[in-house]
């Protein structure tokens, strides 16, 4: 499947040019932002790890082997891509045990930068945000138009699509999810089950968001919407008064779309009509998610870009720095700016 089929239309029109992303790992740097004070004592050893050429699961397996402990004793907040230079936290459960010797885990692809004890393990999704530093090379673009587009993104945000990596190579995860949904079965292997359920859920969300981008109301609240703050999982219904809330213009409050689960859409008015229509079109996937025990949740439709800054180290290089909430994709920001040369089509996720 193509990018436009898996995501949807751009919000701001045609790209301002072309560029290459991820010519090397240093071109895509991700730092996990964790808002948890670590106590310095407890039965969990937290590790601040820098890795390149390894995804999060591979790094966890390496730490487990070096520590001589089962993989289930290793925890992390979010999944980071292999094709990047990333820094993130892991925790090791060591009740009554000394810190293990982890020298065997380290080489040029993995370095342990910090070790801290804490009383609790690191929970999935516990990080607050991810900081990105991206370097786009082989840039061929209209620089004034690119600068104007960046200012627009700073003021208005971008559609909060799930990025391409969620769906696997050529949408393979989604195709596999459809096959399981038709058979009304679930994969026995836990990681595969999680990956396919996430792909299906993400695709349905993207379908709804794509429809709203196409008509231009993805970033505007309307009666019947369910609204949520940027960093909150709770939501509330929008009436006429809520649609005039000044926090919408400040990019603190946003309309949301469905993360599919059991039951129908709790939205109202035109929003419910749209979400129900997508649900009918994709009934096998929607039913499969409900039968798998997924609960209906919401995700903001608009992605605010915090601390956005950019400069041009060379005439054909654009360097971007910004912070995104956990669970959001840096390349959905990039796709509103430029088309990527083929070597840069891989995406990097934050966390499911």
Curated annotation (Swiss-Prot):
**Record: active site:** 81 (nucleophile)
**Record InterPro entries:** PsdUridine_synth_cat_dom_sf, PsdUridine_synth_TruD, PsdUridine_synth_TruD_CS, PsdUridine_synth_TruD_insert, TruD_catalytic, TruD_insert_sf, TruD_pseudoU_synthase
User: Which family does the record claim for this protein?
Assistant: Belongs to the pseudouridine synthase TruD family.
Q: What is this protein called?
A: tRNA pseudouridine synthase D
Extract the Pfam families matched here. TruD (PF01142)
* Reactions listed under catalytic activity: uridine(13) in tRNA = pseudouridine(13) in tRNA
> Ranges for the TRUD domain?
157-303
Gene Ontology CC terms? cytosol
Keywords assigned by UniProt, alphabetized: Isomerase, tRNA processing
* Record-level Gene Ontology MF annotations: RNA binding; tRNA pseudouridine(13) synthase activity
- Give the GO biological process terms: tRNA pseudouridine synthesis
Q: Which PROSITE patterns match?
A: TRUD, UPF0024
Q: What does this protein do?
A: Responsible for synthesis of pseudouridine from uracil-13 in transfer RNAs.
Enzyme Commission designation: 5.4.99.27
> By its UniProt entry, which HAMAP family does this protein fall under?
TruD
């Amino acid at each position: 499947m193509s990018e436009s089929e898996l995501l949807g239309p751009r919000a701001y029109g045609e790209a301002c040019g072309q560029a290459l992303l991820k010519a090397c790992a240093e071109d895509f740097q991700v730092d996990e932002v964790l808002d948890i004070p670590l106590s310095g004592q407890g039965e969990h050893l937290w590790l601040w790890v820098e890795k390149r050429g390894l995804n999060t699961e591979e790094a966890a397996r390496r730490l487990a082997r070096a520590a001589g402990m089962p993989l289930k004793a290793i925890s992390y907040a979010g999944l980071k891509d292999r094709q990047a230079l990333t820094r993130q936290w892991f925790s090791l459960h060591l009740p009554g045990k000394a810190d293990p010797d982890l020298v065997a885990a380290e080489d040029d692809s993995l370095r342990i930068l910090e070790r801290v004890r804490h009383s609790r393990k690191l929970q999935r999704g516990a990080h607050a945000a991810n900081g990105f530093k991206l370097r786009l090379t082989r840039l061929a673009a209209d620089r004034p138009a690119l600068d104007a587009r960046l200012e627009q993104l700073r003021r208005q945000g971008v559609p909060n699509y799930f990025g391409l990596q969620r769906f696997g190579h050529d949408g393979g995860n989604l195709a596999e999810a459809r096959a399981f949904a038709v058979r009304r079965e679930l994969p026995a292997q836990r990681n595969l089950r999680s990956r396919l359920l996430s792909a299906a859920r993400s695709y349905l969300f993207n379908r709804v968001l794509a429809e709203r981008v196409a008509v231009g109301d993805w970033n505007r609240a309307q009666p019947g919407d369910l609204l949520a703050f940027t960093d909150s999982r709770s939501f509330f219904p929008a009436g006429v008064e809520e649609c005039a809330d000044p926090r919408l213009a400040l990019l603190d409050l946003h309309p949301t779309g469905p993360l599919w689960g059991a039951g129908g859409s709790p939205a109202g008015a035109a929003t419910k009509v749209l979400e129900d229509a997508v649900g009918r079109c994709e009934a096998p996937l929607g039913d499969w998610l409900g039968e798998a025990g997924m609960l209906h949740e919401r995700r903001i439709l608009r992605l605010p870009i915090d601390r956005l800054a950019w400069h041009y180290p060379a005439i054909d290089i654009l360097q971007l720095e910004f912070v995104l909430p956990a669970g959001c994709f840096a390349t959905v920001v990039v796709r509103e700016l430029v088309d990527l040369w083929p070597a840069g089509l891989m995406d990097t996720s934050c966390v499911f």
